[in-house]
Amino acid sequence: MAKLLLLHAPHVIPRFSSSSSRSLVSAAALYRRPLLVNPQFSHIGPRLHSPYNRRFSARAFDDSPASSAEMEKEKQEQLLDGVSGKKDEDYPTGEMEYENRNAWEIFVVKFRMLFAYPWQRVRKGSVLTMTLRGQISDQLKSRFNSGLSLPQLSENFVKAAYDPRIAGVYLHIDPLSCGWGKVEEIRRHILNFKKSGKFIVGYISICGLKEYYLGCACNELFAPPSAYSFLYGLTVQASFLGGVFEKVGIEPQVQRIGKYKSAGDQLSRKSISEENYEMLSVLLDNIYSNWLDGVSDATGKKREDVENFINQGVYEIEKLKEAGLIKDIRYDDEVITMLKERLGVEKDKKLPTVDYKKYSGVKKWTLGLTGGRDQIAIIRAGGSISRVKGPLSTPGSAIIAEQLIEKIRSVRESKKYKAAIIRIDSPGGDALASDLMWREIKLLAETKPVIASMSDVAASGGYYMAMAANAIVAENLTLTGSIGVVTARFTLAKLYEKIGFNKETISRGKYAELLGAEERPLKPEEAELFEKSAQHAYQLFRDKAALSRSMPVDKMEEVAQGRVWTGKDAHSRGLIDAVGGLSRAIAIAKQKANIPLNKKVTLVELSRPSTSLPDILSGIGSSVIGVDRTLKGLLDELTITEGVQARMDGIMFQQLGRDSLATPIIDMLKDYLSSLR
């Protein structure tokens, strides 16, 4: 029943939350599945040469000292290469520059609107209404899928900025459970929309840090008198199962490679380690500091004044108004009445509006927002990584290696694409699958520029994929890195004795029982092999990272060791190339493909929403799919609210439970641990 677990993302980032106990970073949900490493994991062959590749130093795998002349030569080679030697400011920003339409362009747009389908028509002077709530997917969604899609949300902001029928945006902001990377992307679109000169009004009922961070970027922010204020700060929580396992009779045998790897800590320790405390403290500092800076910039208040307000523990929404953090206290209908007055709508008439779903159907072509002849492929990779599609997989919920590889190859074999962007939102997963995708991305990067764009998280297997790109772009608060490995095995002798269970093993081969004899501790020679396997997996990962980032191994070792970094810190340590969102990745792709930055390009989404019957049914809801869909949703919710415990279920029970012989015992353990909650 025992199973060797070599985790590229072994630690579970505990949830960052406000004192209201809601998750503000949703990191536990992001780290839902670890990256499992196969002991037979093998190194891919030599790298082919291409004008798009980095110039890799031979010293990447050589720790021997070199003369200053040699080092200076390497430095000059990197600068000539134009990748490793570049600073963030050397890359194009990709910021939106609003362009006023000339008379001919306005005429063409109005003419096209006359022939728009009825469901794509919008009344002149309409207000685009959108509600931000809960999870926000980085994947495209079909009309059959509920929930928000970041690509469609972003597109709606751009269309509304140029649509002469749209007077402004009324944005309702409800509690969010997405990561800070997506929050930064949405905030950027709010700020870009304001460049059009149109208004954007925010409305917030439950004021947490994420919600206010978005709301304060609007022209005006309103709240009802009964609104909740949870601007109390940030906390990080970590849970440990060492004491639980001790009582149950389970003895975890953990070998971690990298002092910041903490998944093993969750299983074997009863308290947080100094290294994990250090890492989480830095992550917390980065998030809090970024929030204070953003609010200070948006409100025009001094950073220390904002921090002092947080430390007062204000819960009355009236205090936010007095401090100038919101415009006014009004009910939703009062805000609508205000908008009617501003737009000159008669009192007995309704405010003309168009909602998010309908406006998503408005074609960019109608608004004259089509791209140019040059095409850039967008390949979206979101969710945990696996080689093949599972029976409960839903569209966009996982990265299926065989499917993604097919898309990557189609881009590589096609001559119509000038560049490609891999949009990654993944905590990792299967190591073999990660390596296979890394290989395909590397081959693609040898034929045309490839830019990796990171969303909320691109750690472990997610970072593994990104390493193959010609350049990596991440948000300030993207969680990335996590270059490290942990091995975990469980000895169940005491548990078996407690429940009266016995297991006899007959084997052939010296190490045949390494992964199957959980009724006893490892023998010395087995423990040695166990450790060597983990060391080998770690060295492969670390050395490939060093090679990909043109960094000596000893330098990569300093930033690896399983440590998770924010995008900002990852950039200062050479793990990524630039800080920004998808728009910046597109600008860098144009630059590397020798496309003028002011020239329009056509973005081709290869990860289109599925229209197959099973996928449509899975998007409709649990009432159609049945128990499996319902249980999957429940597990997702537990992962968010319970943090490490549900995460542990994903590591221990999901992986070990695949062994049919282990299933009865696993079920008993699940029932027992569930009763302890």
From Swiss-Prot:
Molecular function terms, GO-annotated: serine-type endopeptidase activity
Location of the transit peptide in the chain? 1-68
Q: Which domain of life is it from?
A: Eukaryota
Residue positions of the active site: 460 (nucleophile)
Give the Enzyme Commission number: 3.4.21.-
Q: What happens when the gene is disrupted?
A: No visible phenotype under normal growth conditions, but mutant plants have altered response to long-term high-light acclimation conditions compared to wild-type.
Q: Which GO terms describe its cellular component?
A: chloroplast; chloroplast envelope; chloroplast stroma; chloroplast thylakoid; chloroplast thylakoid membrane; mitochondrion
Record region (Disordered): 63-94
The principal localisation class reads plastid
Question: What is the annotated localization of this protein?
Answer: Plastid, Chloroplast stroma; Plastid, Chloroplast thylakoid membrane
Expression is induced as follows: By high light.
One matching Pfam family is Peptidase_S49
Its keywords, alphabetically, are: Chloroplast, Hydrolase, Membrane, Plastid, Protease, Serine protease, Stress response, Thylakoid, Transit peptide
List the residue ranges forming a coiled coil, or say none: none
Ranges of Basic and acidic residues compositional bias?
70-90
| Gene Ontology biological process | proteolysis; signal peptide processing
What family does the Swiss-Prot or TrEMBL record give for this protein? Belongs to the peptidase S49 family.
State what this protein does.
Serine protease that may be involved in the light-dependent degradation of antenna and photosystem II in chloroplasts. May function during high light acclimation in plastids.
What protein does this entry describe?
A: Serine protease SPPA, chloroplastic
Q: What organism does the UniProt record list as the source?
A: Arabidopsis thaliana
